[in-house]
Design a protein with these regions (language model features):
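Alpha-helical packing segments of well-folded alpha/beta enzyme cores
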Residues: 55, 187, 251-254, 300
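C-terminal amphipathic/interface module of NAD(P)-dependent oxidoreductases
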Residues: 288-319
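Rossmann-fold NAD(P)H-dependent dehydrogenase/reductase core
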Residues: 1-225, 307-319
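A short C-terminal helix-loop "cap" of Rossmann-like NAD(P)-dependent dehydrogenase/epimerase domains
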Residues: 168, 224-239
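Short, contiguous pre-domain boundary segments
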Residues: 1-4, 279-290
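A short, mixed-charge helix-start or loop-turn motif at secondary-structure junctions
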Residues: 21, 169, 173, 237-240, ...
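Pocket-edge positions in alpha/beta enzyme catalytic cores
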Residues: 44, 73, 243, 289-292
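C-terminal helical subdomain
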Residues: 180, 233-285, 295-298
């Protein structure tokens, strides 16, 4: 059986508005459920309307009075991301919490986004870079917003080759996944630096779920036509290995801590406190050395603005 970590205290979030990407399943569902339980209004930003509706129904059944709504978002499409940003901007409500969670893992063969980018880089990283940029005015309007970006233990194997950022020459699915999650971690830290320098009032940090039992390990490998049944059987066998896996509510705890705890720090990185950060309650996580490279971070930001077409304001203080 997967590990179950003790629950954590979450402050009253009544009156707060949260947006969670990939909220219909896995860690996104767990985060949405816990935020709703604490009183937040949660917008589930999802690609699949039917799956989103099922998630809303399930959370609503377990959290009486939960304030939930759906917003279409396909992170593999910069046009969809822009449309999501426009829709939320037209609502005019400040966003208190943004959780950049949605992801895809190790599609085979190499797949591309609508805009021609390697799919993991596009969905896991670049799409969230663009979405956060579109929502920046609403986040700044909240006064003390939080942006939590969901990285992974696999960020440790990420390597930057800006001449082969899209894996065109040699595509290694797991390496590409690690790169996308390393990039997202670097984004979280750089967003905090820019917020501090510019007085944006946004606290940006990152979290990872450890080894959580989700459908991420199934949906990605079957994206290119792999056997869904065989992948599910394989993963059920892997999940039987004792001492490694934890359930979704536990895997969501680091993100919930990062999004709500008064002790969570800007630029921080949180994960499970157990063996090799695989399971357990939330605690500061080890930041890969590559995520601390300022020159690479600066270049990644410039490349991301160019590829996404989304520019961020100057991070200098405003009058």
């Amino acid at each position: 059986m997967p590990h179950r970590a003790p629950d954590i205290d979450v402050p009253d979030l009544t009156g707060k508005l949260a947006v969670v990407t990939g909220a219909n399943s896995g860690i996104g569902f767990g985060v949405s459920h816990r935020l709703a339980r604490a009183g937040a209004e949660v917008i589930l930003a999802v690609r699949d309307q039917a799956k989103g509706e099922r998630a809303v129904t399930e959370i609503g059944a377990e959290v009486p009075g939960a304030k939930l709504s759906l917003q279409h978002l396909d992170l593999a499409s910069l046009a969809s991301i822009a449309a999501c940003g426009t829709a939320l901007t037209e609502q005019g409500r400040p966003i208190d919490i943004l959780v950049n969670n949605a992801g895809i893992m190790t599609p085979r063969p190499r797949a591309l986004s609508e805009d021609g980018y390697e799919l993991q880089f596009a969905v896991n990283y670049l799409g969230h870079f663009a979405l956060t940029g579109h929502l920046l005015p609403l986040l700044r309007a909240a006064g003390a917003a939080r942006v939590v970006s969901i990285s992974s233990l696999m960020s440790r194997i990420g390597r930057f080759d800006f001449d082969n950022l899209q894996g065109e020459r040699r595509y290694q699915p797991l390496r590409a996944y690690g790169l996308s999650k390393l990039a997202l971690l670097m984004f979280a830290r750089e967003l905090q630096r820019r917020s501090t320098a510019g007085g944006w009032g946004i606290l940006s940090n990152a979290a990872h779920p450890g080894a959580a039992v989700t459908n991420l390990q199934v949906t990605g490998p079957t994206h290119g036509g792999g056997s869904l049944r065989l992948n599910r059987i394989r993963n059920r066998l892997i999940y039987l290995v004792p001492g490694i896996w934890q359930d979704i509510p536990s895997g969501a705890l680091p993100a919930i801590f990062a999004a709500t705890s008064p002790t969570a720090e800007g630029g921080g990185y949180y994960g499970p406190d157990g063996y090799r950060e695989l399971h357990g309650g939330p605690a500061p996580a080890q930041i890969p050395a590559r995520a601390l490279d300022e020159a690479t971070t600066a270049r990644l930001w410039q490349v991301s603005e160019r590829l996404s077409g989304v520019g961020y304001p100057d991070s200098q203080p405003t009058d």
